[in-house]
Amino acid sequence: MASQLTDAFARKFYYLRLSITDVCNFRCTYCLPDGYKPSGVTNKGFLTVDEIRRVTRAFASLGTEKVRLTGGEPSLRRDFTDIIAAVRENDAIRQIAVTTNGYRLERDVANWRDAGLTGINVSVDSLDARQFHAITGQDKFNQVMAGIDAAFEAGFEKVKVNTVLMRDVNHHQLDTFLNWIQHRPIQLRFIELMETGEGIELFRKHHISGQVLRDELLRRGWIHQLRQRSDGPAQVFCHPDYAGEIGLIMPYEKDFCATCNRLRVSSIGKLHLCLFGEGGVNLRDLLEDDTQQQALEARISAALREKKQTHFLHQNNTGITQNLSYIGG
């Protein structure tokens, strides 16, 4: 095995977020309010199963322990189960997760688990069916809820739910969410609304700091848990009276980037050192053949020397991220 991926600031990288498509069938107000618009990349232009196998093999050799499959909506790929199985071939990768809108969860989650999936994140921004429809553009609330139930029935001991925190939309619904997770092993993760190139006005109107929720959780006796090295950026809180947990992802908080442990590869094979960074390092020309793995690992390691210490969101610099479907949020 090559040496562990480490940047100039001594941060070690155990976590790969791999986008496999930028296509999505939902029209979430904070991501794709006008729906998916092809950018010239057809379905045939996204990474193939073999390319995914090669890129995850290289990252596994460089110390990656966790891979999250993202999009767009990853389950829209017909070969999604094959993709899970391809990542699963790497013994060094202990966790394989997906972030999904839940559209196909009820139908397919058992097959995904059989293929090797170990974790699920489902996007649910409201527990009110009408508001869910208004936010996502899809009247699929009951279908998504049934999918979460199906995940538990398939054997997943915990399901993570992502909720984008928005002022005057859902920030006042904490009690509703807490009631939902009281007897369910769900880690509900409130994610601060982030500014993107296409979402400046939405951000100005609806952004609210997760600090508001954190203060309220602490007031109610919730306890801050320690992070594991391959965990994502959430600050996780537990309470003895609840089966579920609360996570807070606050990218505008001081020192948010200090614990960064993740890298991103887009659905067309570009390595992104930060969700809000500029450009990207092309890897695709080194994904054509198994014999290129050493060169691929070298390019990944070399690119890491250019990773910045922090993002520049506080300066209203969102980098290349025009919307969150592009490199998987």
Swiss-Prot record:
Primary role: Catalyzes the cyclization of GTP to (8S)-3',8-cyclo-7,8-dihydroguanosine 5'-triphosphate.
Organism: Escherichia coli O7:K1 (strain IAI39 / ExPEC)
Pathway terms, separated by semicolons: Cofactor biosynthesis; molybdopterin biosynthesis
Swiss-Prot/TrEMBL cofactor(s): [4Fe-4S] cluster
GO MF annotation list: 4 iron, 4 sulfur cluster binding; cyclic pyranopterin monophosphate synthase activity; GTP 3',8'-cyclase activity; GTP binding; metal ion binding; S-adenosyl-L-methionine binding
UniProt GO BP: Mo-molybdopterin cofactor biosynthetic process
Amino acids binding [4Fe-4S] cluster 2: C257, C260, C274
SUPFAM superfamilies: Radical SAM enzymes
Catalyzed reactions per annotation: GTP + AH2 + S-adenosyl-L-methionine = (8S)-3',8-cyclo-7,8-dihydroguanosine 5'-triphosphate + 5'-deoxyadenosine + L-methionine + A + H(+)
UniProt record similarity statement: Belongs to the radical SAM superfamily. MoaA family.
Residues holding [4Fe-4S] cluster 1: C24, C28, C31
Cofactor: record remark: Binds 2 [4Fe-4S] clusters. Binds 1 [4Fe-4S] cluster coordinated with 3 cysteines and an exchangeable S-adenosyl-L-methionine and 1 [4Fe-4S] cluster coordinated with 3 cysteines and the GTP-derived substrate.
Name of the featured protein: GTP 3',8-cyclase
Keyword Nucleotide-binding appears in the UniProt entry: yes
EC number: 4.1.99.22
Residues that coordinate or bind S-adenosyl-L-methionine: Y30, G72, S123, M194
Gene responsible for this protein: moaA
Catalytic EC class: lyase
Keyword terms of this UniProt record: 4Fe-4S, GTP-binding, Iron, Iron-sulfur, Lyase, Metal-binding, Molybdenum cofactor biosynthesis, Nucleotide-binding, S-adenosyl-L-methionine
UniProt domain Radical SAM core: residue ranges: 8-234
InterPro entries on file: Aldolase_TIM, Elp3/MiaA/NifB-like_rSAM, MoaA, MoaA_NifB_PqqE_Fe-S-bd_CS, MoaA_twitch, MoCo_biosynth_MoaA/MoaC, rSAM
KW S-adenosyl-L-methionine (keyword) present: yes
Subunit structure: Monomer and homodimer.
One protein family per Pfam: Fer4_12
Binding site for GTP: R17, R68, T99, K160, R262, L263, R264
